[in-house]
């Protein structure tokens, strides 16, 4: 038909004016950011760092490890999850190309492919690391994970790592294998009685007036490994959760059967 002939002529005329597509190249920042420090995020960070790439490992909670650290055994070998996870956590903490930033969240992302400016919000932990203490001129100071502060803290709260089935203090660590081994102040619960400050003594690790900090890093790529959360099963009334004692969540079950859990695995 005449219409078909016109369409062919138009396509030929358009093709005659086409220009070659020339690939564009842009300089890429040789640094990477991994958001989420569960087992997936840690492995991604280790792979990048081992390839010689500076890597920022960002974790919103006070410790790396993610959900896997709450599990008892892993399929198919039934190995203890902590036995697999803890060496990897140590490798992350020791790797010279990994800058581990716990208790930190991504605030803003700007830039373009290969060149991103990431603004990070470093939440106030209330406790200085040894490096932070040294930077403030406190020789030999900073938290060493001794736990003296938690022993004297009068505030008792449910431990979210144990799914609320065990207590923790207002200054706390989730569990004994945390990385980094630095205590954190729950400012929503802290009554600022200063008992922890006195217990810390010459280490001067506790700063109850600490404020959030904003840090900007430049990276060429970002990996999102933010993991998962349980669905709010309280909304499913037909399941009987929180109505019957023998209805529990999968993570509560994991903590109950775990030898290091609140019931010692019983």
What spans do the regions from the language model cover?
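A short, basic/flexible loop-to-alpha-helix module at the beginning of a structural domain
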Residues: 13-30, 129
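Non-heme iron-sulfur electron-transfer modules
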Residues: 22-24, 61-87, 101-104, 110-141, ...
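N-terminal Rossmann-like FAD-binding beta1-loop-alpha1 element of flavoenzymes
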Residues: 32-57
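A structural motif corresponding to the C-terminal end of an alpha-helix
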Residues: 91-99
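Acidic-histidine catalytic/liganding microenvironments
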Residues: 95-96, 146, 193
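Rossmann-like dinucleotide-binding core of oxidoreductases
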Residues: 100, 253-254, 261-266
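Central beta-strand plus flanking loop segment that forms part of the substrate or channel wall
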Residues: 245-258
């Amino acid at each position: 038909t005449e219409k078909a002939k016109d369409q062919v002529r138009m396509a030929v005329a358009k093709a005659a004016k086409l220009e070659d597509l020339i690939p564009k190249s842009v300089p890429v920042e040789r640094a990477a950011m991994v958001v989420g420090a569960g087992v997936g995020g840690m492995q991604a960070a280790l792979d990048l760092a081992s390839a010689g790439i500076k890597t920022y490992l960002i974790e919103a909670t006070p410790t790396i490890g993610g959900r896997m650290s709450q599990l008892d055994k892993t399929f198919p070998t039934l190995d203890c999850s902590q036995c697999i996870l803890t060496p990897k956590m140590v490798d992350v903490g020791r790797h010279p190309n990994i800058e581990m930033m716990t208790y930190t969240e991504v605030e803003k992302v700007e830039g373009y492919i290969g060149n991103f400016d990431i603004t990070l919000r470093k939440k106030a932990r209330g406790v200085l690391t040894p490096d932070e203490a040294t930077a403030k001129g406190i020789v030999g100071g900073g938290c060493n994970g001794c736990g003296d502060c938690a022993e004297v803290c009068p505030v008792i709260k449910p431990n979210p790592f144990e799914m609320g089935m065990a207590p923790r203090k207002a200054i706390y660590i989730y569990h004994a294998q945390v990385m980094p081994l630095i205590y954190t102040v729950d400012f929503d619960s802290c009554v600022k009685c200063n008992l922890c400050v006195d217990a810390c003594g010459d280490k001067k690790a506790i700063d109850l007036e600490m404020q959030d900090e904003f840090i900007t890093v430049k990276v060429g790529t970002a990996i999102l490994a933010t993991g998962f959360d349980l669905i709010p099963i309280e909304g499913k009334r037909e399941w009987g959760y929180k109505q019957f004692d023998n209805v529990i969540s999968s993570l509560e079950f994991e903590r109950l059967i775990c030898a290091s859990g609140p019931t010692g695995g019983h």
